[in-house]
């Protein structure tokens, strides 16, 4: 055992224990194209085996921000990995990608094998939901950088799309219809404000039970994993009905919807066309946040916005329904005369 390293605060044995514990979770994510297992210097993936004619790789990286603080407060670490995967694969799926593989990065003050197994099990759960292989990762024990009970989590996803099938919003025109896919809650953005509003201003705890939330513990509601939209979007991409996709993350409707819309156009959104989840009403009240500002921060119950032609709107809704997914007609694309997003 490297005694000097141990005395410096880094446990090599704990690192070995983590690898041993997570192997079964990694194995669950195996999919066509994955070559070998973990333990090499790099993760391998055979792109040729998938049969793409003009493959374009699409990548994305993200973390879960201060949602980790809520996980720590609640002592619940088994789902935060799903959030990490979701934030990455939803971004690349918004460009039409089929996720292929994922790598995670965990930095911590002290290597706790049992806790890190919980985290990685969540990462594996997310990879299974997204049908992508967990082909590598890094766990960095960094005493002096983090407190012993602190850790951070980030990830990196790579997907592929046919060059001719990349979804970039360039074909969006006036009159196209905007369809919203529901979120599962706050997802993974805005948690610095969430914590300030609920825990500092309102004085709630993760164990607070509110009638507005059906009596469920506040911590459980906040830690509801970010929805992974890969399997929701796949049949829509195959049907060729989607012109553009906006993943509603940090910046809410106001910052994300314009990212898919060509210059000279704007999104007209009809308020009341979808059910706003109760957690957002609780946040707005607790933090005394202006109602319209909420749309510039949170997803407000809509995690993805799709742009489709008016002729394909009914077909899109039928495809969603046939796959057990919900969708809401939010509004349409209009000529830009003022703001990028019109909320009325």
From Swiss-Prot:
Example GO biological process: 'de novo' IMP biosynthetic process
EC number(s) recorded for this UniProt protein: 6.3.3.1
Pathway(s) it belongs to: Purine metabolism; IMP biosynthesis via de novo pathway; 5-amino-1-(5-phospho-D-ribosyl)imidazole from N(2)-formyl-N(1)-(5-phospho-D-ribosyl)glycinamide: step 2/2
Subcellular location: Cytoplasm
Single GO molecular function: phosphoribosylamine-glycine ligase activity
InterPro entries: PurM-like_C_dom (IPR010918), PurM-like_C_sf (IPR036676), PurM-like_N (IPR016188), PurM-like_N_sf (IPR036921), PurM_cligase (IPR004733)
Matches recorded under PANTHER family: TRIFUNCTIONAL PURINE BIOSYNTHETIC PROTEIN ADENOSINE-3 (PTHR10520:SF12), TRIFUNCTIONAL PURINE BIOSYNTHETIC PROTEIN ADENOSINE-3-RELATED (PTHR10520)
Annotated protein name in UniProt: Phosphoribosylformylglycinamidine cyclo-ligase
Organism per entry: Bifidobacterium adolescentis (strain ATCC 15703 / DSM 20083 / NCTC 11814 / E194a)
Chain's gene name: purM
């Amino acid at each position: 055992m490297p005694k000097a390293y141990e005395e410096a605060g880094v446990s090599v044995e704990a690192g070995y224990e983590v690898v041993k514990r997570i192997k079964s979770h990694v194995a669950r994510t195996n999919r066509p194209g994955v070559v070998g297992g973990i333990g090499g210097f790099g993760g391998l993936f055979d792109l040729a085996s998938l049969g793409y004619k003009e493959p374009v790789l699409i990548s994305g990286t993200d973390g879960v921000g201060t949602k980790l603080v809520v996980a720590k407060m609640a002592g619940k670490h088994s789902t935060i990995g799903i959030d990490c995967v979701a934030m990455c694969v939803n971004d690349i799926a918004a460009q039409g990608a089929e996720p292929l593989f994922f790598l995670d990065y965990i930095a911590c003050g002290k290597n706790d094998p049992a806790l890190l197994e919980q985290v990685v099990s969540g990462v594996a759960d997310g990879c299974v939901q997204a049908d992508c292989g967990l082909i590598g990762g890094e766990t960095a024990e960094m005493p002096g950088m983090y407190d012993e009970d602190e850790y951070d989590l980030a990830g990196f996803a790579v997907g592929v799309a046919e060059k001719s099938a990349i979804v970039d919003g360039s074909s969006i025109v006036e009159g196209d219809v905007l369809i919203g896919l529901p979120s599962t809650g706050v997802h993974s953005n805005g948690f610095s404000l969430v914590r300030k509003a609920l825990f500092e201003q309102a004085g709630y705890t993760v164990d607070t039970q509110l009638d507005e939330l059906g009596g469920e513990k506040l911590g459980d509601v906040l830690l509801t994993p970010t929805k992974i939209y890969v399997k929701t979007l796949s049949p829509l991409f195959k049907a060729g009905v989607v012109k553009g996709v906006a993943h509603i993350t940090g910046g809410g409707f106001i910052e994300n919807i314009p990212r898919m819309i060509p210059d000279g156009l704007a999104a007209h959104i009809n308020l009341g066309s979808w059910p706003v989840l109760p957690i957002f009403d609780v946040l707005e009240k607790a933090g005394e946040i202006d109602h319209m500002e909420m749309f510039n921060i949170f997803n407000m119950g809509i995690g993805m916005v799709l742009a489709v032609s008016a002729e394909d709107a009914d077909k899109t809704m039928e495809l969603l329904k046939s796959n057990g997914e919900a969708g809401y007609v939010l509004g349409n694309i209009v000529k830009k005369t003022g703001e990028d997003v019109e909320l009325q």
